[in-house]
A protein has these predicted regions:
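Short conserved segment of the HATPase_c
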Residues: 158-172
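Conserved catalytic submotifs in the C-terminal HATPase_c
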Residues: 71, 96-106
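Conserved glycine-rich
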Residues: 199-200, 204
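Short helix-loop "hinge" at the ATP-lid/N-box region of the Bergerat-fold HATPase_c
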Residues: 125-127
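Conserved micro-motifs of the catalytic ATP-binding
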Residues: 64-69, 107-110
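Short alpha-helical segment of the dimerization/phosphotransfer core of two-component systems
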Residues: 45-53
């Protein structure tokens, strides 16, 4: 593994304990007025998102161990789970989230936790780069023998070099995305790593007013019970 990436993974592991302490500290505050309760909720939300990314980075470290089994996964249930977790954040930041499921095939071959992280990181990226009072989009649809999950934002254009890496199917390491201020590219790096592990097609489409990120997974032949 790249030395720079390895250093990032090591640093992330060291951050896990203090982030957990921060979360517990925020949860321990009681009897607050409305304004302070809002601050507390944001502290908890920020710490939980940071812990999730640390956990994702830890998973990247373990991908070579082939511990993540592939199995039939209900794609809509995964997306619903992510939306439920992030909807508060979208509303807090005055963003809308449009959701459309048109897929007939509900089961895909994937690892549930890795797929959840892919959708989570793409959606978090979309929320961050869509402007205030604009919307992000989550669309799930059939594409021949696959199911495609598309996350669309209306933010600054994705730099061409990052787009080429996504088109190739994976990002080598987190990079600063100059046209998207404040980005480390960490979420895209995580999503591309997990997608590659699952042998999923992953990529991006550049628009004049934003970017669509997608991941495609093979349809499971198992009959869905959902």
């Amino acid at each position: 593994m790249d030395v720079e990436v390895d250093s990032i993974l090591l640093a992330a592991h060291e951050l896990k304990a203090p982030l957990a302490v921060l979360r517990q500290l925020a949860l321990s505050f009681d009897g607050m007025d409305t304004a302070n309760e809002r601050i507390r909720s944001e502290m908890v939300s920020v710490s939980e998102r940071a812990i999730r990314q640390v956990n994702d980075l830890t998973r990247i470290k373990r991908l070579d161990e082939r511990l993540f089994d592939m199995e039939p996964v209900a794609v809509r249930a995964v997306c619903d789970d992510v939306v439920k977790e992030l909807m508060y954040l979208f509303r807090f930041n005055q963003r809308d989230l449009y959701i459309k499921y048109s897929n007939r095939a509900n089961l895909v071959i994937a690892n549930r936790e890795l797929l959840r992280s892919v959708v989570y990181n793409f959606l978090l990226n979309a929320m961050h780069y869509s402007g205030v009072e604009t919307r992000s989009e989550l669309v799930v649809k059939d594409k021949k023998d696959k199911v495609r999950i598309v996350i669309r934002d209306y933010g600054p254009a994705l730099p061409r070099d990052v787009w080429k890496e996504m088109k190739r199917g994976w990002i080598k390491k987190p990079t600063s995305i100059a046209m998207r201020p404040g980005s480390s590219g960490l979420g895209l790096f995580i999503a591309s790593k997990f997608s590659r592990y699952m042998n999923a097609n992953v990529g991006a489409v550049r628009h004049r007013d934003g970017t669509s990120f997608f991941v495609e997974l093979p349809i499971s032949k198992q009959v869905s019970l959902f």
